[in-house]
Regions:
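His/Asp/Glu-rich mid-to-C-terminal helical/loop segments that flank catalytic regions of hydrolases
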Residues: 17-20, 24-32, 68-81, 188-242
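Hydrophobic alpha-helix feature that most strongly marks membrane-spanning transmembrane helices
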Residues: 88, 120-124, 176-179, 186, ...
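Helix N-terminus capping/helix-initiation residues
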Residues: 108, 128-129, 205, 229, ...
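Hydrophobic, well-ordered secondary-structure elements that form the walls
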Residues: 115, 174, 219
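Zn-dependent metallopeptidase/amidohydrolase metal-coordination segment
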Residues: 132-216, 234-265
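Short, highly charged C-terminal tails/helix-capping segments
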Residues: 40-44, 97-107, 233-253
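Midchain, well-structured core segments that form catalytic/ion-binding scaffolds
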Residues: 1-142
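Short, intrinsically disordered/low-complexity patches at protein termini
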Residues: 85, 96-97, 207, 219, ...
Length: 266
């Protein structure tokens, strides 16, 4: 409810206060979830730019991550309770709008090992002096960079790990249904952070294209192996079934939620 913040603040009900209290609640929740849980948020609407007005509307966008779908669902329930509590404390109304969701990625060591073997069969890309100089300049702008050796030029041995890279992708949903493997290549200078301007600056560079083509060849090699070696495919399927332990894929997106641009409100 909008009102004049100086003359009649008692008549207003601040949605911005509710969002602020909600965000504070998120901070306290961090102490009581698993260390692998990630809770991100961005205030996308503060209700306006006039401080002398009780803000009648406000909006916050929340992104939750965890190692598995069940944990995300549990944290989501608690986050929604915090939102309801914030609305109750401020006398405001609440609307929860579900935007998107993806599933956790199920690792597959059978395919991972085969993918690395295919990488090792390939010749490493040859980078020109200009390529190295460009990557070195970009790397020098990053405190974690290595301007003297900006391009990774080795292929490490396969190392089975259970921790999946904590970025969100709908590849995770695919991995619940069929054995799945992903490969990464040095398309960024050593030490580059994702979503940084340095990552954007090299996205269309020659070294990035060369590394991408190499990974494409390795992935094609995995596909050929699966066609020519039925036993490899069966081993990958067996591993997937073992990891799922009888669990069936359930889409984490509720029924009725349709794709849309984030800028479009429900």
């Amino acid at each position: 409810i909008s009102s004049h913040a100086g003359i009649s603040p008692h008549l207003g009900r601040s949605a911005l206060d509710a969002v602020t209290l909600f965000n504070v609640g998120i901070q306290f929740l961090r102490e009581h979830v698993l260390p692998s849980v990630r809770m991100h948020y961005a205030v996308t609407d503060t209700g306006g730019f006039s401080p002398n007005v009780v803000q009648p509307t406000a909006e916050v966008l929340v992104l939750l991550r965890a190692e598995d779908n069940a944990t995300v669902a549990d944290v989501r329930s608690r986050v929604e309770d915090i939102a309801r509590g914030a609305a109750l404390m401020t006398g405001t109304e609440l609307e929860i709008d579900f935007v998107k969701a993806t599933s956790n990625t199920v690792p597959n060591h059978v395919l991972g090992r085969d993918a690395v073997e295919n990488l090792k069969l390939l010749k490493l890309p040859e980078f020109s002096k200009e390529d190295v100089e460009f990557y070195s300049k970009i790397s020098a702008t990053n405190k974690n960079g290595n301007p003297g050796h900006p391009i990774a030029d080795t292929i490490p041995d396969f190392k089975p790990v259970e921790i999946v890279f904590p970025a969100s992708s709908d590849v995770g949903d695919v991995s619940w249904i069929v054995p799945t493997v992903s490969l990464s290549a040095p398309t960024w200078p050593v030490g580059t952070a994702a979503h940084s301007w340095q990552a954007v600056a090299v996205g269309k560079s020659t070294p990035a294209h060369k590394a991408t083509l190499m990974v494409g060849e390795a992935m094609a090699g995995v596909a050929v192996d699966l066609i020519e070696k039925p036993e490899l495919l069966e081993q990958a399927k067996e591993e997937l079934n073992r990891r799922l332990k009888g669990s069936k894929y359930e889409c984490p997106i509720p029924k009725g939620v349709v794709p849309r641009a984030l800028s479009m409100k429900k």
